[in-house]
């Protein structure tokens, strides 16, 4: 007989259906409402079990903390309580006090305390001071250096003459002293009312035009080098908004001093001549100082002799505008007539041949003769082209065209 302690094993009943058929049939046989209710109940049970476990863990942690506190109260003679405050400070870690962040940088090995932002005197340094500066000066010096460089570049662009200390002295003329000083101040230059030769704030540039002898002597005797410039340099800097090189606009004060001394001795040498007085002096036959000195280089005159000391302006103008001084190529008949007239004049006045040399163009083309009709046609076409593009009487080109005699 089987004992009471032994458990009866249930007999396996044969499944009348195929494998999986009974399971599928059982699922289909259960309605959908019952399945949904069973799943929701299982989820609620899981949540309840998790909350119970969490509460139990919290209770155990609180019990452990209470036990630790009770032990410390029961044992008042703790060796740690008798330690010095310095040892307690050493037991703390910096990582527990100062939390890392993106604004705090780690201290490098080569860090020196002189680079600190909040560093006080070295004698008052506390070895247990945990509030060491976390940002060295190297990081801030770079940013400050970048800011200063950018500000300097902006000032140079706006005020290119910021480093210039100028003194302006302009007399009567085409330049205005007020306009030049205003342009210098707009460009950032400091304008001085007088020449300051001190080393603290000396004058670096002197804008001069028709200045006095005293200022020129001061500039030439100054120990500090001063750049003397004309007002055109200021106009160039103002138009370009840039510090233009002074080499093209330099002024030598010694040369100006020499001219000033000459002007005081004989003022007529430097004063410009009046055009009306100039023409009267040339047309006046009694005044022949210029023509007496250069009589050897003059061309022969038609109505004059080289021995005479007087000069007739009308004869000179008639000679320059005569047919002998016409420009371009001349035909054969005209050239022969002109050569005949010149030969007759030379025979009548043989002394002129020895004293005055002939023109070079007459010597070059005296032996030239037209032999064929083709050359004649070429000359005629050239003459037509010349007449089409003939310069005016008062044109400067007329003086440069060479004379050709055939």
Swiss-Prot record:
Compositionally biased spans, kind Basic residues: 12-27
GO cellular component: cytoplasm; cytosol; nucleus
InterPro entries named among the record's database cross-references: BRCT_dom, BRCT_dom_sf
Keyword Transmembrane helix: no
Biased composition (Low complexity): 35-45
GO annotation terms (biological process): meiotic cell cycle
Region (Disordered): 1-88
UniProt xrefs under SUPFAM superfamilies: BRCT domain
UniProt domain BRCT: residue ranges: 156-251
Alphabetical keyword list: Cytoplasm, Meiosis
Compartmental location: Cytoplasm
CDD domains per the UniProt record, alphabetical: BRCT_microcephalin_rpt1
Function recorded in the entry: Has a role in meiosis.
Protein name (Swiss-Prot/TrEMBL): Meiotically up-regulated gene 176 protein
Species of provenance: Schizosaccharomyces pombe (strain 972 / ATCC 24843) (Fission yeast)
Originating gene: mug176
């Amino acid at each position: 007989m089987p004992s009471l302690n032994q458990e009866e094993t249930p007999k396996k009943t044969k499944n009348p259906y195929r494998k999986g058929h009974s399971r599928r049939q059982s699922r289909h046989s259960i309605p959908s409402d019952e399945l949904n209710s069973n799943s929701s109940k299982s989820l609620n049970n899981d949540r309840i079990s998790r909350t119970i476990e969490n509460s139990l863990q919290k209770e155990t942690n609180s019990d452990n903390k209470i036990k630790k506190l009770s032990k410390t109260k029961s044992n008042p003679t703790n060796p740690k309580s008798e330690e010095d405050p310095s040892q307690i400070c050493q037991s703390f870690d910096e990582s527990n006090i100062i939390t890392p962040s993106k604004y705090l940088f780690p201290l490098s090995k080569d860090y020196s305390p002189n680079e600190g932002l909040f560093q006080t005197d070295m004698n008052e340094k506390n070895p247990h001071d945990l509030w060491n500066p976390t940002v060295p000066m190297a990081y801030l010096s770079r940013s400050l250096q970048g800011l200063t460089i950018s500000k300097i570049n902006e000032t140079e662009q706006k005020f290119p003459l910021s480093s210039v200390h100028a003194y302006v002295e302009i007399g009567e003329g085409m330049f205005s002293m007020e306009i030049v000083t205003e342009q210098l101040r707009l460009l950032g230059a400091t304008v001085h009312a007088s020449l300051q030769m001190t080393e603290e704030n000396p004058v670096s540039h002197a804008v001069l035009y028709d200045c006095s002898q005293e200022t020129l002597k001061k500039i030439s005797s100054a120990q500090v080098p001063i750049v003397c410039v004309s007002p055109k340099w200021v106009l160039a800097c103002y138009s370009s908004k840039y510090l233009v090189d002074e080499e093209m606009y330099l002024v030598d004060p010694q040369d100006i001093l020499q001219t000033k001394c000459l002007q005081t001795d004989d003022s007529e040498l430097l004063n410009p001549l009046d055009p009306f007085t100039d023409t009267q002096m040339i047309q006046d036959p009694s005044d022949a100082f210029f023509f007496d000195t250069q009589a050897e280089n003059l061309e022969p005159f038609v109505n004059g002799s080289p021995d005479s000391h007087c000069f007739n302006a009308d004869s000179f103008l008639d000679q320059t505008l005569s047919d002998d001084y016409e420009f371009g190529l001349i035909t054969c008949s005209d050239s022969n007539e002109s050569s005949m007239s010149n030969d007759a004049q030379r025979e009548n006045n043989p002394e002129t041949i020895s004293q005055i040399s002939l023109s070079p163009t007459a010597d070059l083309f005296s032996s030239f003769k037209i032999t064929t009709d083709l050359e004649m046609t070429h000359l005629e076409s050239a003459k037509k082209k010349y007449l089409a593009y003939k310069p005016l009487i008062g044109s400067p080109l007329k003086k440069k065209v060479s004379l050709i005699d055939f």
